């Protein structure tokens, strides 16, 4: 590869999980943004869903409709890996110069992950361009990022694998803290934690509440999910780690949520559950469904 060749993260889910036609995609984004809830405080971070845009768009829009696009120079997205088994307790990162969207490119930031971490964190960063490029839990945010910021921000992406201990959570939080402090700084960086919530039904191998009346099952799932969302919003990372370690869950982004919760706790961010819903509200109701939540984090300090 020549030194001038750009490393481009190609959009693999356009025309599949969201419209690949720019004008239609703009109309779709406008619709979701018009349905978003107004949030008076300065947003610093968010936990958001990543399903196909017809499902996740409402949850994503609650954050993007309330972001000051002039306030940030950097966006970092942490997501789970759905397609590649990753080594645990490490941060799997990319080195792309640009991220493709139907609305135009988003500048990358390959230098963000490259410098060797300080002593004690060496070896915690693993190059994973291939896994990153095929991950919908990252790409589904690109249209909103491009629509909101244009080319004003630089985008960095990481996949979070299983985290085996609180020590591992804290170590990767140390690493992220160091990266951001050496980059744009906290006040100019917006963090997105990518996760859907409970996947319920035989197709997902998860039916702890049986196959009883659908409404009753949905209410029990919602109660469990809201407990998780509350612990994340309040920075109760040890409670979350205990919950995820001791009980079965199909929250696909539980490890990014753990890492984000620790990070936001350190920064003094406070979260609120802005929206909770499931796929049955957006299509034919079935016994199998996926739940989604948007949790918005704020601080009193302006970005």
Residue ranges and their predicted role:
Residues 3-262, 266, 277-283, 296-303:
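Active-site histidine-anchored catalytic micro-motif
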Residues 268-273:
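Acidic/polar loop patches that form or flank catalytic/metal-binding clefts of enzymes
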Residues 289-294:
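Short hydrophobic/aromatic beta-strand or adjacent loop that forms the aromatic wall/cage
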């Amino acid at each position: 590869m020549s030194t001038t060749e750009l490393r481009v993260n190609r959009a693999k889910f356009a025309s599949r999980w969201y419209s690949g036609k720019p004008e239609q995609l703009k109309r779709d984004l406008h619709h979701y943004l018009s349905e978003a809830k107004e949030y008076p405080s300065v947003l610093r971070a968010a936990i958001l869903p990543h399903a196909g845009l017809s499902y996740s768009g409402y949850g994503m829009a609650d954050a993007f409709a309330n972001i000051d696009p002039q306030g940030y120079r950097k966006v970092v997205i942490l997501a789970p890996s759905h397609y590649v088994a990753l080594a645990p307790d490490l941060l799997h990162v990319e080195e792309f110069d640009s991220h493709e969207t139907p609305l135009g490119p988003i500048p990358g930031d390959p230098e963000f992950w490259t410098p060797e971490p300080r002593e004690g964190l060496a070896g915690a960063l693993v190059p994973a361009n291939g896994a990153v490029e095929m991950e919908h839990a990252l790409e589904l945010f690109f249209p909103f990022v491009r629509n909101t910021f244009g080319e004003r921000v630089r985008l960095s992406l990481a996949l979070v694998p299983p985290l085996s201990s609180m020590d591992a959570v804290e170590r990767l939080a140390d690493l992220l803290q160091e990266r951001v402090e050496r980059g744009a700084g906290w006040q100019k960086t917006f963090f997105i934690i990518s996760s859907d919530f409970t996947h319920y039904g035989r197709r997902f191998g998860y039916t702890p509440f049986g196959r009883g009346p659908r409404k009753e099952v949905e209410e029990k799932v919602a109660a469990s999910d809201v407990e998780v969302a509350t612990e994340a919003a309040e920075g109760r990372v040890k409670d979350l780690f205990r919950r995820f370690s001791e009980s079965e869950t199909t929250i696909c982004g539980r490890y990014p949520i753990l890492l984000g919760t620790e990070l936001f706790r350190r920064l003094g961010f406070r979260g609120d559950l802005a929206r909770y819903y499931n796929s049955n509200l957006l299509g034919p109701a079935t016994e199998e469904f996926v739940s989604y939540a948007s949790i918005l984090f704020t601080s009193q300090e302006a970005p």
